[in-house]
Amino acid sequence: MKEHKARKRFGQNFLQDTRIIGDIVNAVRPQADDVVIEIGPGLAAITEPLAKKLNRLHVVEIDRDIVCRLKTLPFADKLVIHEGDVLQFDFNGISGKKKIVGNLPYNISTPLLFKLAEVADDVADMHFMLQKEVVERMVAAPKSNDYGRLGVMLQYFFDMELLIDVPPESFDPAPKIDSAVVRMIPVKHRIGKADDFEHFAKLVKLAFRQRRKTIRNNLKELADDDDLQAVGISPQDRAEHIAPEKYVALSNYLADKAV
């Protein structure tokens, strides 16, 4: 079969390190009847070992040439192929608690993670290969350089752990950056429940809009010093010093005050 060349516009870098592949499959722990969705199966490096353990495997792929290849594989009868852009994919259209796995294209990773947060209630767990820098931002704790909006928002929905470091030579073509595998497990209200999620999301976005400024300056449209101090936030603090649960508490305090 004609060799498939990675396409930059789809952010394709194909995993080829058998040890890393085995570690990812072991982390996913697929059982025969699990509902598993793989994003971007590519040349089936993870697809094949997953399919061996599953009765059925859903795959989402935008590249038509790869879709054609998938249909010719020996285990193709186990695959449910969804051709199209994963950012437009209806995850709720597949019933059951889902395990989602994938080597995510770096160029769409952040919007895709926010999209997946919206379906967290129907997810058992997720395992993704991502740019290591992104994973470090996702799992970062307050008062660290990597802590920011992405971490706060995803930590609202998930417990997350960096599982596996993946060097560039594990891929073909080799990217210019390091990668890592992250495990994401939905946890309801781990940092408290936002009474108005849209308000909470807006507040967090504003808080981190200018990292060098104080929280007083960044949130002056929404809160004054008394509001901040009411939930234990110093107006002189910067956004990266404030724990996720404090943002939830402030959002709820302001929502109650507005009623």
Curated annotation (Swiss-Prot):
Provide GO CC annotations from the record. Answer: cytosol
Enzyme type, top EC level: transferase
- Give the binding site residues for S-adenosyl-L-methionine: 13, 15, 40, 61, 85, 103
Quote the catalytic activity from the record.
adenosine(1518)/adenosine(1519) in 16S rRNA + 4 S-adenosyl-L-methionine = N(6)-dimethyladenosine(1518)/N(6)-dimethyladenosine(1519) in 16S rRNA + 4 S-adenosyl-L-homocysteine + 4 H(+)
The UniProt keyword set, sorted, is: Cytoplasm, Methyltransferase, RNA-binding, rRNA processing, S-adenosyl-L-methionine, Transferase
Keyword Repeat on entry? no
What is the designated name of this protein?
Answer: Ribosomal RNA small subunit methyltransferase A
Q: Which organism is it from?
A: Neisseria gonorrhoeae (strain NCCP11945)
